[in-house]
Design a protein with these regions (language model features):
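Canonical Rossmann dinucleotide-binding motif of NAD(H)/NADP(H)-dependent dehydrogenases/reductases
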Residues: 1-29
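Catalytic loop of short-chain dehydrogenase/reductase
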Residues: 89, 93, 97-108, 127-181
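The beta1-alpha1 cofactor-binding region of Rossmann-like NAD(H)/NADP(H)-dependent oxidoreductases
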Residues: 35, 56-71, 101
Length: 244
């Protein structure tokens, strides 16, 4: 049975991603900053007859929490087949000219450094998989090209901190994929689309089912699948790739 760790999986897109991977026969380590919320999510899925999962407390912004999660999962499996770095925060819609630097640091600590922490912590388990997959959940708001295109439908939506954190995540994904280019790894930045979740007060047009399906698609890639790409069905439905 293949295994996957999903961070921020107690609700919304992460939760639905867990459900869809469970339906494909994966064993899921459902990561949640709050263990209580994670346990509640596990019980909901078990009530649907999806039993191959367990909650893992993991705060991606906390070194000790990530290390503890690695120890806990390491007691249960020697191999991790997929890592979905889904946990993220928005930071609201601040002004770059006046927002305290602490807000920038907080968002980057989760959206970028959190991904680095978790990926490094679980790299040894991923390396033991014959088909390791890493999905870094990004956003079209991290695209420099789109933000410079006045015809883009979200051109005026300048997320002053969230956007740069995802741009940085995209570059990290490129470098990680390059470093792992001669291995079986597939590492991609995947935009699930503007989805109706509590992350955006349910303002997005997409559904969590559609968003999760995109993440699952790239978490289960075949050996000939892409790596080091910025993937988005929304921004480039004809190619599946988003402009950087």
């Amino acid at each position: 049975m293949k295994t996957a760790l999903i961070t921020g999986a107690n609700k919304s897109i992460g939760f639905e991603t867990a459900r869809q991977l469970l339906q494909q026969g994966y064993y899921i380590y459902l990561g949640s900053r709050s263990l209580e919320n994670g346990l509640e999510a596990v019980e909901k899925l078990k009530a649907e007859g999806l039993n191959h999962l367990e909650a893992i407390q993991i705060d991606v912004s906390n070194d000790e929490s990530v290390k503890a999660a690695r120890v806990e999962i390491g007691k249960k499996t020697e191999v991790l087949d997929a890592l979905i770095n889904n946990a993220g925060i928005s930071g609201g819609m601040p002004q770059t000219t006046s927002t305290d630097i602490a807000v920038f640091k907080e968002v980057f600590d989760t959206n970028l450094f959190g991904v680095v922490r978790v990926t490094q912590a679980f790299m040894d388990l991923l390396q033991k998989s014959t088909q390791p997959r890493i999905v870094n959940v990004t956003s079209g708001l991290g695209s420099l090209t789109l933000h410079n295109d006045p015809t883009w439908k979200y051109y005026n939506f300048k997320a002053a901190i969230y956007g740069p954190s995802k741009t940085a995540l995209n570059m990290y994904t490129i470098v990680l994929a390059y470093e792992l280019r001669d291995t079986p790894f597939k590492v991609n930045a995947v935009d699930p689309g503007y989805t109706a979740t509590d992350f955006n007060q349910h303002s997005g047009p997409g559904t969590v089912q559609e968003a999760a399906a995109r993440l699952v698609k790239y978490a289960t890639l075949d050996a000939d699948g892409p790596t080091g790409k910025f993937l988005s069905d929304d921004n480039s439905p004809e190619t599946g790739e988003s402009p950087w």
